[in-house]
Regions:
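Phosphate/nucleotide-binding beta-alpha loop and adjacent structural elements of enzyme active sites
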Residues: 1-289
């Protein structure tokens, strides 16, 4: 057993793919860690192609034979203004929703627009990839719905979508969690889990001596959408294996993986389930919420 990034991982050697898992990172700024991607790159046969429009953040990205990044935005294919904010993680095509953000600590500072640059966006569906996308991460600060709208063909043919949304939009003209959820459900996905739940406290209250802590209010949700069960039953062996590896390494959804492995066993007539369950007995599991 190896402890990496604070969690216990064991390599699933008995489940291997013949083609790489293709990851697509839309909004690839390194300002927020993406451990769920790094683990997959480290532990499986996988590659990543990413897109980041903010030049200052783009130049921080590490390129390699497995990591290719491009300095442009994914969207509706039109020219837009990119609002560069004081906090790089708040930079967006959309303008911050100041009336809402001012209710919380520090966001009036973090959301300040320092400069505006004109950018040409590209539709996800118009970008050529050597292979179909398996895991798509969308972190575009309120612009998720447009990425999905103009990338629905690529998205509906993928396996897992990880996206950051908010029940109440943090940006003007942004769509709420419910809207994005409906978009992805219409493309054959179900909401499986929240990989992170971000709470914030309303000013002036502070919890745990930290402005980053909240009591109950749901500020942002890192959502994991997975192919619905009908779609899963129609996956071929290769894609089912990819889904298993993504859900095992990236999201630690061990009971769901058990279900997927049982489906793989039926499909291939090979004994995977006993090996997997022996492996699971050695894992230390912890609920996120």
């Amino acid at each position: 057993m190896t402890r990496i990034y604070g969690i216990i991982l064991i390599l699933v050697k008995f489940i291997q793919t013949t083609t790489p898992i293709q990851i697509c990172d839309i909004g690839a700024s390194p300002v927020d860690k993406t451990e769920f991607i790094e683990i997959l790159l480290d532990k499986t046969n996988s590659n990543i192609i990413g897109f980041e429009p903010n030049k200052d953040e783009f130049i921080k990205l590490e390129q390699s034979s497995k990591k290719k990044f491009f300095n442009y935005a994914i969207g509706d294919g039109k020219v837009h203004n990119l609002n560069i904010c004081y906090a790089p993680g708040m930079t967006s095509i959309l303008k911050p929703n100041y009336e809402y953000l001012k209710l919380f600590h520090k966001f009036d500072e973090w959301s300040e627009i320092l400069k505006v640059i004109s950018i040409q966006t590209k539709k996800l569906d118009e970008i050529y990839f050597d292979n179909s996308l398996d895991l798509i991460k969308i972190d575009v600060q309120g612009y998720e719905s447009e990425v999905i709208k103009f990338g629905d063909d690529k998205i509906k043919n993928s396996l897992v979508i990880q996206t950051e949304t908010s029940p109440i939009p943090l940006y003007e003209n942004g769509k709420p969690f419910s809207y994005v959820c409906n978009q992805l459900e219409n493309l054959g996905f179900n909401l499986h889990m929240f990989s992170k739940i971000h709470n914030r406290s309303f000013k002036p209250m502070i919890f745990n001596n930290s402005i980053y802590s909240g009591l109950y209010h749901l500020f942002q949700l890192d959502c994991v959408f997975v192919k619905n069960f009908k779609e899963i039953d129609e996956l071929d062996e290769e894609n089912l294996k990819k889904l298993i590896l993504i859900m095992f390494y990236s999201f630690k959804s061990y009971d769901f993986v058990d279900l997927l492995v049982s489906k793989l066993e039926v499909k291939t007539k090979k004994n995977y389930l006993n090996q997997y369950r022996d492996l699971v007995k050695t894992l230390k599991m912890q609920k996120l919420y």
